Amino acid sequence: MNETPKPNSFRSGPDEDGRFGIYGGRFVAETLMPLILDLQDEWNRAKNDPAFQAELKHLGAHYIGRPSPLYFAERLTAELGGAKIYFKREELNHTGSHKINNCIGQILLAKRMGKTRIIAETGAGQHGVASATVAARFGLPCVVYMGATDVERQAPNVFRMKLLGAEVKPVTAGSGTLKDAMNEALRDWVTNVEDTYYLIGTAAGPHPYPEMVRDFQSVIGIEAKEQMLAAEGRLPDLVIAAVGGGSNAIGIFHPFLDDPSVKIVGVEAGGKGLQGDEHCASITAGSPGVLHGNRTYLLQDSDGQIKEGHSISAGLDYPGIGPEHSWLNDTGRVDYVPIMDHEALEAFQTLTRLEGIIPALEPSHAIAEVIKRAPTMGKDEIILMNLSGRGDKDIFTVGKILGMGL
């Protein structure tokens, strides 16, 4: 682990250059720099503008359905026989995941900037659906770049995006997953800077995206903190979330970072195991490098070439992680651990049977970690987990693996 000094606050970053310690920054083509700086200026104005915040709050309540509930998982808690388990139910949001929180915020920014075309990248298709949804709501054309592999394994979401009026462009380069989709979206943006807004779906990319996405997603943790105090009269002992690029995780983690009594764990995609290359555990098994405009932990070879990762879950199938997570790892504030495909699949089925909630494969990784940790904790202790998405999109993948023809 890189030793990083502990700051006075874990919530004060990034600095004016968009850095969290040695991570983050703005590594972009010269043609994009003026646009990135425009975006940063607009973001700084918007976040201090009461009218912008009021519109965001109004759409959150009436379009997304916020606040999302805090749910005590009674049967899972009883089954595991340890800590009380609570879920932040982000899968109940409009479009079925946390992704919409960020999309609403960014499309309001795009409108403020006078942009007339939206582009986005997507892995699991949840961010693509959320982007297409907000584009439809605000009457803007939308192009979604999606790896060809993901187009195949996320058919329901591809259909949803098309229904919503978005153009889905399959990307066959590389392994045809999220990294490749992001590369294509960046290429599009460079050539269409005047009219196009790039709606990034995770807490990565060049500054100000990691900060912006985190702030739009922090509504999760802010609500959860209030709800937990109302339900239990105190904060949780442990907060857990799955981490791909890391937007759902930073959204629930950030409001708790300066509460020393709260332990925080991020769960990476361990895929088929960390020995080979078939995983996406960037922090557990990667090293710092530069990808998609920011310095962060990446899966790369000794020459700095980005490896093709693997995860059963399309949304975690990314060979990097948001820069703030890299910094939180190095400061020791957050622990990052891997969960394998088979453990996530088991957790998916366990939650479905015990609580009547079909989770997405992404948060199923976090559920698997909850299943490991809860029995080792006291019955008076509390776990809070971010249930970031619903599993409708994954039933074909799971059905195939379990040998159930759909």
Swiss-Prot record:
CDD domains with a match to the protein in the record: Trp-synth_B (cd06446)
Broadest EC class assigned to this enzyme: lyase
UniProt EC number: 4.2.1.20
Cofactor(s) essential for the protein: pyridoxal 5'-phosphate
PROSITE patterns in alphabetical order: TRP_SYNTHASE_BETA
GO cellular component, one term: cytoplasm
Pathway the protein acts in: Amino-acid biosynthesis; L-tryptophan biosynthesis; L-tryptophan from chorismate: step 5/5
Domain of life: Bacteria
Modified residue annotations for N6-(pyridoxal phosphate)lysine: K99
Pfam families referenced in this protein's UniProt entry, alphabetically: PALP
Keyword Glycoprotein among UniProt keywords: no
Catalysed reaction, written as an equation: (1S,2R)-1-C-(indol-3-yl)glycerol 3-phosphate + L-serine = D-glyceraldehyde 3-phosphate + L-tryptophan + H2O
GO MF, one example: tryptophan synthase activity
Protein keywords: Amino-acid biosynthesis, Aromatic amino acid biosynthesis, Lyase, Pyridoxal phosphate, Tryptophan biosynthesis
NCBIfam families: trpB
Self-association and partners: Tetramer of two alpha and two beta chains.
Family: Belongs to the TrpB family.
Its biological purpose: The beta subunit is responsible for the synthesis of L-tryptophan from indole and L-serine.
Name the UniProt record assigns to this protein: Tryptophan synthase beta chain
Organism: Rhizobium johnstonii (strain DSM 114642 / LMG 32736 / 3841) (Rhizobium leguminosarum bv. viciae)
